[in-house]
């Protein structure tokens, strides 16, 4: 339709978003954007679209070759027919696939990314939410993972591209930190100022002046020589400091680009 309307598909692409696939392509019926649809739904749709675009090419090229045969048989303009074939513009456009938060750990992310690439995707978008607690980007209650977890998934997607011989595959790293006030776990810092330490600096904490008052099973950290206790919710999640979202986004973007991402997606905290 785009090619017929614009006479060209240049600068066009197909984007398969997770919310669209969840709403329209799940065997469970319409679902919210929470990674509850089958993980193979996206690769299946990629293959369907890619096959359809190639079939559109085959159909139009058949007509062009028929025109060439007729020109040769009837003394027509063979050069014009050949030029039409040589200048034919394919219907196939880049396919960008949303892998959500990877549908599992880094190995699961790698396997699913391979399926998407084999089906025809040249670009994969991945986000830093917790896979089994994923929310729609504009909803409250989002939970992010530490950088080490997210970067391992970016690497997993890159390995999938490289294993399939795709040297120029594109990875879009999406950060949901702007609207996320929670994290699933406290990463282990090996040295002051390392990535885990920077991540932990955004945690909402309470000062501990008396170690005897630390409750059973509670977590404590040492920050700048002071013992602090991260604020933990009854569900086990840890809270970030209020107003720290933008700073967390900046750190997310820098670390993603340093570790293999090609493009950045900063998800807004509300649909504005």
Predicted segments with their positions:
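Alpha/beta enzyme core
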Residues: 1-272
């Amino acid at each position: 339709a785009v090619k017929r309307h614009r006479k060209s598909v240049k600068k066009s692409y197909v984007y398969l978003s997770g919310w669209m696939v969840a709403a329209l392509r799940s065997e469970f019926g319409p679902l919210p954007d929470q990674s509850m649809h089958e993980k193979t739904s996206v690769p299946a749709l990629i293959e369907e679209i890619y096959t359809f675009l190639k079939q559109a090419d085959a159909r139009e090229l058949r007509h062009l070759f028929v025109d060439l045969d007729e020109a040769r048989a009837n003394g027509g303009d063979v050069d014009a027919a050949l030029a039409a074939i040589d200048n034919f513009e394919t219907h196939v456009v880049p396919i960008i696939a949303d892998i959500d938060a990877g549908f599992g750990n880094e190995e699961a992310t790698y396997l699913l990314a391979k399926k998407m690439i084999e089906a025809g995707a040249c670009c994969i978008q991945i986000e830093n939410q917790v896979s089994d607690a994923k929310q729609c980007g504009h909803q409250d209650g989002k939970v992010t993972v530490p950088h080490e977890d997210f970067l391992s998934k970016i690497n997993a997607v890159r390995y999938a591209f490289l294993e399939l011989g795709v040297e120029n595959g594109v990875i879009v790293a999406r950060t949901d930190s702007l609207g996320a006030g929670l994290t699933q776990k406290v990463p282990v810092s090996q040295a002051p100022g390392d990535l885990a330490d920077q991540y932990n600096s955004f945690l909402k904490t309470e000062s501990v002046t008396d170690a005897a008052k630390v409750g059973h099973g509670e977590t404590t950290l040492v920050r700048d020589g002071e013992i602090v206790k991260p604020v933990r919710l009854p569900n086990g999640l840890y809270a970030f400091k209020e107003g720290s979202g933008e700073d967390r986004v900046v750190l997310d973007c820098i670390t993603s680009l340093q570790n293999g991402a090609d493009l950045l997606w900063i998800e807004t905290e509300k649909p504005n």
